[in-house]
A protein has these predicted regions:
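Short, structured surface patches at the beginning of a domain
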Residues: 1-131
Length: 131
C-alpha cells in the first residue's frame, strides 16, 4: 500500500463589507462551515487565515492571504480551503497566477460552495475553464 500524503489545510476566510457579514458570509460562519468540511475530508487544519474588510480585487493587498501563500511555499500546508471562489479572488488574471503557483508547490484549492477542487482531474478542468 502506498503512503498517502498527509492533508494539511489552510482555511481562508474573507469579508469585504459589513453587508456581506450580515448576509451569511460572516467570518465566523465561513470558518465554521470550512472546519466541518475539513473534518469530513479528514484534513488537519494548519491555520485559519482571516482578511476582514478587504476586497478580493488584488491578492497582494491581503496580509492573511499572502501569509497563507508563504506558508504553502514553506511546505506547511498542501490544501487551501475557502467558502467560495470569490472569497479567494474575483480576478481571472489572479486566478491564473494562483493556480500556477498552487501547481508549482503541489497544493490544491477547494472552494466549498462552488464545487472547486483542484485535487481532481475534473476540478482542475473546471478551474481552467474559468481562467
Amino acid at each position: 500500500m502506498e503512503n498517502e500524503e498527509k492533508k494539511i489545510a489552510g482555511i481562508y476566510i474573507r469579508v469585504s463589507t459589513e453587508d456581506q457579514a450580515r448576509e451569511g458570509f460572516s467570518l465566523g460562519e465561513q470558518e465554521e462551515k470550512l472546519r466541518q468540511l475539513c473534518k469530513y475530508k479528514d484534513f488537519e487544519i494548519f491555520k485559519v487565515y482571516k482578511d476582514a474588510g478587504i476586497s478580493a480585487k488584488n491578492m497582494k493587498d491581503r496580509p492573511a492571504f499572502q501569509q497563507m501563500l508563504d506558508d504553502m511555499k514553506a511546505g506547511k500546508l498542501n490544501y487551501i480551503v475557502a467558502y467560495k471562489l470569490d472569497r479567494v479572488t474575483r480576478s481571472v488574471r489572479d486566478l491564473e497566477v494562483l493556480i500556477s503557483t498552487l501547481e508549482q508547490y503541489h497544493c490544491y484549492l477547494i472552494c466549498d460552495r462552488d464545487d472547486v477542487n483542484t485535487s481532481t482531474a475534473n476540478g482542475r478542468f473546471f478551474v481552467r475553464m474559468l481562467t
